Every structure is written in structure tokens, then in C-alpha cells.
Design a protein with these regions (language model features):
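Short alpha-helical segment that forms part of, or immediately flanks, the ligand-binding pocket
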Residues: 19, 37, 42-46, 60-61
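Short alpha-helical donor nucleotide-sugar binding micro-motif in glycosyltransferases
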Residues: 12-13, 20-25
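Conserved acidic donor-binding segment of nucleotide-sugar-dependent glycosyltransferases
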Residues: 65-66, 70-76, 84-90
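Aromatic "clamp/platform" in nucleotide-sugar-dependent glycosyltransferases that forms part
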Residues: 33
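Short hydrophobic beta-strand element within catalytic cores of glycosyltransferases
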Residues: 50-53
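Nucleotide-activated donor-binding/catalytic signature segment of Leloir-type glycosyltransferases, i.e.
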Residues: 1-12
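A charged, aromatic-enriched C-terminal amphipathic alpha-helix characteristic of glycosyltransferases
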Residues: 94-125, 129
Length: 133
């Protein structure tokens, strides 16, 4: 793929610098076989960076293939998606970047708080129903 001239291994960077590094990229690529929190995916999306990552059940609600990125299963899928990205016109890339940024909104602290609040409300209702006299 001749990507070596376009890939930079930075080593450790401070948390304050993270956003600048995401903005320097065009596509977030991950070959991770397991994720515990998936913060890197949310951070990349928040910066409008589409994702290319190994298929993982925890990412089903994160990556919408062809919209805000892709998931791949095998090396061939990965290579195909890289070629697809490289061949995309500026308008198509821009649309995908916009969709990436929009999809990150579900990871905002406000949305997280709303989801947690709903869970608590459901559990309170369930408790009251089960313990009604």
C-alpha cells in the first residue's frame, strides 16, 4: 500500500495533545482484537475522523459501515477499505467525516447522563412495582 511515508509513530503524548494528533489524520485505523472502553474510537469520531477497525461486537453501535467508517474481518477486507478510502473523492470523504462527527454526539457526557438516568428510573419503577403492598 506504500503507506509508510504517511504513517507516523509518535510514542507517548500527553492527554492535552491528543486532539491535535487526531486532527492531523484522515482515517483512524485500529487492529485491536478487544476493547474495554473504546475511548479512542469516540475521540476519533469527535474529531470528525472516520474509523477503520477490526470487527468487534462492542463496536456495532459505534461504526456504521460506509457512513462513519468501516469494520473489517480479514486482511483482504482491510486492504479493500484502505483502497476505497484512498480512491474517494473529496466530497465523499467530507460527507463521511461529517457523519463521523455527528455520530460522536451519542458519546457526549450529556447523552451518557441521560442514558444512566433512564436506567435508574426504570429500576426505581421496577422496584416499586415489585415491592408494592
Amino acid at each position: 500500500l506504500k503507506l509508510a511515508k504517511n504513517v507516523i509513530f509518535t510514542g507517548m503524548i500527553t492527554p492535552e495533545e491528543v486532539g491535535r494528533y487526531y486532527q492531523a489524520g484522515d482515517l483512524f485505523v485500529s487492529a485491536s482484537t478487544s476493547e474495554t472502553q473504546g475511548m479512542t474510537y469516540a475521540e476519533a469520531l469527535a474529531g470528525g475522523i472516520p474509523l477503520l477497525c477490526r470487527r468487534d461486537g462492542c463496536l456495532e453501535q459505534v461504526v456504521t459501515d460506509g457512513e462513519n467508517g468501516w469494520q473489517y474481518d480479514e486482511k483482504e477486507d482491510y486492504l479493500m477499505r484502505i483502497q476505497e478510502w484512498k480512491g474517494m473523492g473529496e466530497n465523499a470523504r467530507s460527507r463521511m467525516q461529517n457523519k463521523a462527527a455527528i455520530s460522536a454526539e451519542k458519546f457526549s457526557s450529556g447523552n451518557f447522563a441521560e442514558r444512566v438516568e433512564k436506567i435508574y428510573e426504570q429500576q426505581i419503577r421496577k422496584y416499586r412495582y415489585e415491592n408494592a403492598a
